[in-house]
A protein has these predicted regions:
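C-terminal motif of bacterial Sec signal peptides marking the signal peptidase cleavage site
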Residues: 17-20
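Early extracytoplasmic/lumenal segment of secretory-pathway proteins
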Residues: 24-95
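Extracytoplasmic ligand-binding site segments that recognize negatively charged/polar headgroups
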Residues: 37-45, 80-221
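Short beta-strand-to-loop elements that line the ligand-binding cleft
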Residues: 59-65, 86-87, 203-209, 246-248
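A ligand-binding cleft/hinge motif common to bilobed small-molecule-binding domains
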Residues: 91-95, 218, 224-243
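Periplasmic-binding protein-like
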Residues: 131, 195-200, 206, 229, ...
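Mature extracytoplasmic/periplasmic domains
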Residues: 258, 263-320
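Conserved C-terminal helix/tail region of periplasmic/extracytoplasmic solute-binding proteins
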Residues: 318-350
Length: 350
């Protein structure tokens, strides 16, 4: 009896070792994936951790603004150090696609996108969320200064706002590029550049990242910001700030499409394709609102973003944004923008 029990025990141990060893081998065989992420880091980290837990693929990431990613992959052309780009506005993605830096793919989950505008016509990138551009301000500071909050774009030109306004540097942030393109589409190219030349007099800082102003407004370092309203909701809901007001411009505003794509020359291509499928699934996009990212989702099987709805973002109407014009002429507009503003230490790159 003891002999039989010993044999059984040895068999169980051998089987356990076999399963364990093969499990480790399978995990090793799953390989790795490197992600450049331009969404907020909480969501980026959660998405990469979830992908790794679902697939066994060892996933590492680096958080960079879209402008930084674009610069980096241009320098690495043909030999990228990352496989996938996750999050951030599509204007820089379009620049990357035009330079042949992205790999077209056809993920099955793209069938769940709620509109054709949420993917590149040539399958270079795919949308994962939508964010609305607007204004926000420190209510305590405006009260102290005895100033009314801005209601429309031209209000930002008021001389009493001198040194109070901020938005993102178009060289480092897709948000800045979107603001430039939005004004061109609302006012026309020349009028938009005249507008930015005047607005520059009121700018205290062009931040490195798109979410920068939303982080600095509640602390009083900046009084009025231009950026995405979901970033403001984060400051209210997650950080508990009660001194922030926000609105959308009365004459019209635009929106970002946050995207994901594979870099041409990706070293872990099969895993990169798996990640794109994952990025277009509820497993990924539903993590956003659980990690402080309150953009509207653009796949038909995702959960509604209740926090954004409670804060009224679903009631904001947006303009028909011309993505083709931004894609074709954006680089020219950005160059013109930097010609009309004062290039000094207010333009942040770090």
């Amino acid at each position: 009896m003891k002999k039989n029990l010993g044999l059984i025990l040895m068999s169980v141990l051998a089987l356990s070792c076999f399963v364990s060893c093969n499990s480790k081998k399978a995990k090793k065989d799953a390989g790795e994936l490197v992600v450049y992420g331009s969404c907020e880091e909480e969501y980026l980290a959660a998405a990469c951790a979830k992908f790794e837990s679902l697939t066994g693929v060892r996933t590492t990431f680096q958080r960079l603004s879209t402008g930084e990613v674009l610069t980096k992959i241009e320098e690495e052309k043909g030999n990228p150090s990352a496989d996938v780009w996750f999050g951030g506005t599509t204007d820089p993605y379009n620049e990357a696609a035009a330079k042949g830096l992205l790999l077209p793919v056809e993920p099955k989950n793209a069938s769940h996108l709620v509109g054709k505008q949420f993917k590149d016509a040539n399958n270079n990138w795919f949308g994962i969320y939508r964010g609305i551009l607007g204004f926000f301000w420190n209510t305590e500071e405006l009260q102290r200064l005895k100033l009314e909050p801005p209601k429309d774009w031209d209000d930002l030109l008021k001389p009493e706002y001198k040194g109070l306004v901020s938005f993102a540097n178009p060289n480092t942030a897709g948000t800045g590029k979107l603001i430039v393109n939005t004004m061109v589409q609302l006012k026309g190219e020349k009028a938009a550049m005249d507008y930015f030349a005047k607005l520059d007099k009121n700018i205290c800082q062009y931040t490195k990242s798109g979410s920068g102003p939303s982080k600095l407004v509640p602390t009083g370092e900046i009084v009025i910001g231009i950026g995405f309203l979901h970033d403001v909701v984060y400051q209210i809901v997650n950080n508990g700030y009660t001194n922030i007001g926000m609105t959308s411009p009365s004459s019209g505003t635009s929106y970002e499409i946050g995207a994901t794509a594979i870099f041409k020359g990706a070293k872990n291509l099969d895993n990169a394709k798996k990640f794109i499928e994952f990025a277009l699934s509820p497993d990924c996009v539903n993590l956003a609102q659980d990690n402080g990212s309150y953009q509207f989702l653009v796949i038909d099987n995702a959960k509604p973003v209740e926090v954004a709805i409670k804060n009224g973002l679903d009631k904001i109407e947006t303009m028909v944004y011309n993505f083709d014009d931004a894609k074709t002429n954006g680089p020219k507009y950005y160059a013109e923008f930097f010609e009309v503003i004062s290039k000094d230490d207010r333009v942040k790159t770090k």
